[in-house]
Amino acid sequence: MVESSKQNLDALKDEYKSVQRGYLPKLDAGASYSINEHEYPNNPKKRANAYGSINYMLYDGGKKYDIYDGYETNIKSGEKSLDALKNNLSLTVIQYYFDYLSLEAKKDAKQKEIEQLTAQEDRIGRFYNAGTTTEDELQKIVSRLQNAIVELQEIELNIITITHNLEYITGTQVSIKDGSKLEDINNLIQKNPRFDIQALDFVTQSKQSVAQAQKSGYYPTVTLDNTFNYYDSNYDNSTFKDPNNHQNIASANMKWNLFSFGQTKYQYESKQKEYLASRSNFEYEKNKADVDLQLALKSYNIAKAKIKSTEATLKAAQSAYEIIKSKFENGLIDNVAFLQSLTEKYDAISQHKKAINDLEVKKATIIYHSGEKLQEYIRW
């Protein structure tokens, strides 16, 4: 995707160079040879002709500079679109990366839960074989263990899916390791709109230049021409011979369209309306982007609060689990309370780690909406 956008941008730059070269003087050359059936004073039996001409558009009604402005803003738009694409991909990769870490934390918690359930299955199984507990007590543990195993498989599938998605985006095999974070954004100041909004602004400016270029139809065009011809005439009748064998013609030409049934007017109005439509769309998208940034800032503050909340939940769940586990193993409570406490403990562990990872995604979202390059904020 990025390489394709680069190629399109390079193609636009080459096209602009071609247009610029088109306004430079043009030099042409040509030659001809003819044999006529009948000979006349101005029509020899045989004639060879060679010519060279130079042509220059001195003035085109001001259209040239509007065309130049249009190409330059289109190129700037292409550059910002490329930055927007890179930033979009960076944000997507960051989201996948921290989702992957959250799933790995969830997987680790689930594996530890399975270890605890397996140990309790063995313990209750021994009591059941000894006749000191009922079968339903054992089956509750077995059922919870099987559910945990299925949940682990689902987590592993989600991890594989993220890995494949990252490989699709990057085009290479990926190996994900923990440790990457984003720089602190407390001092981040929005200097520019989002890259796609900047690109849209340049597109709008380009349409304005195209509209202005239509006004050139109201003004004359002036060209300068110089043509040199060389003749080699071969007459059978020597009285027809002309002593002159060359001719040079220099001319200055002006063309001014005085009336065209409103063609120029309607061309301008058409392009002007396209510009106004683009300007309206730009203002809408710009306002929407401002709202997106404000929402991202609020989400970031909520994410910070969620970390504190999940941390408190985790401490409570761990404390409750240790107490309930001790009571359960001493036969003071049934396994329903124990299983509930076990699930809450490991859910709290994974939720806390997920909250930490989600905060990094929220930071990335703010950087993205602030018109900054995400790659410059990643700490490996």
Where are these regions (language model features)?
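Bacterial Sec-pathway N-terminal export signals of envelope proteins
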Residues: 1-28, 132-136, 167-212, 219, ...
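Small/polar-residue-enriched beta-strand and adjacent coil segments characteristic
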Residues: 26-85, 202-207, 217-285
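Periplasmic alpha-helical coiled-coil/stalk elements that build and connect Gram-negative outer-membrane
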Residues: 86-198, 203-205, 211, 296-299, ...
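A short glycine-centered flexible hinge/capping loop motif at secondary-structure junctions
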Residues: 128-132, 328-332, 369
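Short terminal targeting/anchoring segments
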Residues: 136, 332-354
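C-terminal structural cap/anchor segments
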Residues: 267-309
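C-terminal hydrophobic structural anchor segments
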Residues: 296-334
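Acidic, low-complexity, intrinsically disordered peripheral segments
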Residues: 351-380
